[in-house]
Amino acid sequence: MVDVIITGGGPTGLMLAGELRLHGVHVVVLEKEKEPSGHARALGLHVRSIEVMDQRGLLERFLALGRQYPLRGFFAGITRPAPGRLDTAHPYILGIPQNVTERLLAEHAIEAGTEVRRGCELAGLSQDDTGVTAELADGTRLRARYLVGCDGGRSIVRKLLGIGFPGEPARTEWLLAEA
């Protein structure tokens, strides 16, 4: 039995895995995709994420593969706070594609002792007084004390548990091109 199963090998799941390993927790990450994505998806890290990477000793890896952009002090037409007044040692946005972020976080989690299983899709789960049993699409079962769903907006964990997604979908459309 492992301590924690994390479903989802994106930035959230991989960062959580690394954090748990720092505390000696036995972690397995299940990612349904067989190979890492080659697509950018998201394009960068904001100040607080950069600060966390620095606190964990990971920032140099990110800086080596990203590009720093000065902060701009606006969001949805709001011009405050002024960037020069933010209390941070990192007054920039780091342009770095999500697939690179995921690779760096996976390397860190694996170096810390996390087992990352790719091509493993969660198909079912059951819970009792001693933990959780995860059933994978191939019929394999894995037992853990806890299971954490870090599997995104279309979360299979949330669906299996009957947890709704309250609120409304975003009304903003974006176009991202890799040219």
What are these regions (language model features)?
Residues 1-12:
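Beta1/beta-strand and adjacent pyrophosphate-binding region of the FAD-binding site
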Residues 2, 137-146:
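Core beta-strand elements of the Rossmann-like FAD/NAD(P) dinucleotide-binding domain
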Residues 7, 142-152:
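Short hydrophobic core segments
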Residues 21-42:
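Glycine-rich FAD pyrophosphate-binding loop
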Residues 38-110, 126:
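Active-site-adjacent segment of FAD-dependent monooxygenases/related oxidoreductases
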Residues 118-132:
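A conserved short coil-to-beta-strand element within the FAD-binding core of flavoproteins
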Residues 149-163:
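Flavin (primarily FAD) binding-site architecture
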Residues 160-179:
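Glycine-rich loop(s) and the adjacent beta-strand/alpha-helix scaffold that form part
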